[in-house]
């Protein structure tokens, strides 16, 4: 993988995480009655989505419908069968109950 490809992958991950974080912040602001602030966070999240989609397209991560469905099935299957069971096991071993609940939900 070239440096640029690594940078694109890192940028995609960062923009994607920022999107989800800003949406979580917006939800919190709504709960606190701060609708204007929530709107700002949603706008920032939307901008991050545009950036993430651009990086994903350049990386060749958006294909035809059949391929997109297969990538989704494979990814969700991995999470369900391998990733989360291991995460749950490790969190249980560390006695981190909130993490166990988060990984199960």
Which residue stretches match the model-derived regions?
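Non-heme di-metal
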Residues: 1-105
């Amino acid at each position: 993988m070239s440096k640029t490809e690594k940078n694109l992958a890192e940028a995609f991950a960062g923009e994607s995480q920022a999107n989800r974080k800003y949406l979580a912040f917006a939800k919190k602001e709504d709960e606190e009655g701060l609708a204007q602030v929530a709107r700002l966070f949603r706008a920032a999240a939307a901008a991050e989505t545009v950036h993430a989609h651009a990086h994903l397209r350049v990386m060749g991560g958006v294909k035809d419908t059949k391929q997109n469905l297969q990538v989704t099935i494979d990814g969700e299957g991995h999470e369900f069968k391998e990733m989360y069971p291991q995460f749950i096991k490790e969190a249980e071993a560390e006695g981190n109950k909130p993490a166990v609940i988060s990984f199960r939900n």
